[in-house]
Every structure is written in structure tokens, then in C-alpha cells.
Amino acid sequence: MWGRVATGTVSFTTTTTQEVHMSVTCLSHPCEADPSVDIPAVDLRPLEPGDSCAVSEVFAGLGAHSRRLRFLTAKPRLTAGDLRQLTAVDHHDHVAILAVSTAQDRPIGVARFVRDPDRPDSADVAVAVVDAWQGRGVGTMLTSALVRRALEVGVRRFTMAMSPHNEAAVRLLHRAPGEIERLALDDETAEFALVLGDPVPRPWLRRLLARPVR
């Protein structure tokens, strides 16, 4: 998925109606590049408060296993409250970016961060890509866009909770730009903080998550 460089622009309209243009660049990692894999034709755009159908469609594209990895519990459906929470975006404290297949004009992934009110430079982050599009670079594109927007609005630290068995999340974290702080690790959940910055090689990450927890 890192065999090409994808560029584009995502425009955010804030609550003060100021339009912000954010360039998106997905850079290849020298250890991960695979020239035989093309980054697909995907448009990125900000998720809007009225995009509950798009959020529902991405959720519907996740199998039971993917849902458990994303939500860390069995999640057969999204409730009305879930949808309200997931679409309560303001492009500053709650930012979400939607990936849409250009050919099919259908949502295929979403990445978001929600700022910590007690620590304004920190935000919780989550990424979901429908099963049919996993492993094709969509998560990487979404994460790159999310990092750029975070830096624009003063977020310097991402926190995340994930299953140690979530290979896609491990790959994204392995290539993420910045320094990783390990917060907690047990059989079910791994919690990390990512201080945003330049990419840092971290071969220890896979070894850490693969080892038995005592």
C-alpha cells in the first residue's frame, strides 16, 4: 500500500464558516513499500453532521470480527445515540474524515479524533475501513489526513486503545509519524499515545504486541 504517493486536498468549513484547505500527502515507508500495489482511487472529505447514512454504511461494511476490533466489544448495530455521537463533528475538537470510493461513489472508511477537554493538545483517535477495502492503503490515507488536520488545530498527541490482535491498527501505528508512549497492555487491550512528529522506525512494536501478557 506504500508503493505510491497520493496527494489531494481536503477542505474544512469550521463553525465560524471559515474554509480551511488541507493538503493530503501519503508518503511511502522504505521498509513497507510494495510497488506492485496501487493506492486506489479514493476521495477524502470531511464528515459532516448530516452524514449518519455514510457512517452507517461504513459500519455495515465491517464484519463481526472487524467490529470487535474497532469497538473492543461485540457491536451488532449502531444505536441512534451512537450515530448522534459519531456525527457530532465541528472540524476542530471533533474531526472526522470520510473516504469515498471514486468509482463506486460509496463511503469505505472513516477516521476521527476527539480532543481531550482536560488536555487540549491531546485527542483520542480511531480509524475504520470496510472489510472489502482493507489492506489497500485507505487507512494510511485517512491517517495522514487526520494527522495534518490535528497539527493545524493544535493537537500534538493522539491516544488510542486497540486490540493487540488488530493487525491493521498495528501496521498503521508502526508507520505513524512520531514517538510512541505505551500506556497499558493486557490480553484484550493495548493503549498507546503517539506524540506527532517525524516517522520513527519502531521494530519493537510488533514484538511487544506479539508476546504473551503475564
Q: Where do the model's predicted regions map?
A:
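Short, Lys/Arg-enriched N-terminal segments with co-localized hydrophobic residues
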Residues: 4-21
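Long, contiguous binding/interaction regions
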Residues: 17-214
